[in-house]
Amino acid sequence: KFLQLAKTEPKCDGVLVLIDADEDCAANLAKELAARAEKLRLPFPVAVVCAKCEYEAWFLASLETIRGSCDIPDDAKFEGNVEEIQGVKGWLTRQMPKGKIYRETHHQVRMTELLDPTRVRMRSRSFRRLEHAIQELINGEITVSPR
């Protein structure tokens, strides 16, 4: 529906679709959504990116720059593959002081501002895909991506 709405916007030069893959295969889901977008024959390019497993996993990849703010304690540590953890929102909540919970509407923007792209790039393939998709849109290299 959003792509149909964007089609009516005369100044739309491209759309980045960014969603959580959750338990789905990020690559397959992105290809499926891109195929659906291609059928719409949109007058602008569309890039689809699926964060594996959740957008918030990128916060774990840059935890060193986030801890000490956003209700995350200075000593918070995550060990493991950030692209394999399910329930990142719950993990973030468990790090917070008692009575606090992670809320996308409250924490997501600030945590995103604190991300270190270099750290996240090294630890997350789906983030590298995001960067590539943005570059494709900027360069006007695509109609729909991935193919």
Per-segment meaning from a language model:
Residues 2-147:
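C-terminal accessory helical subdomains adjacent to catalytic cores in phosphodiester-
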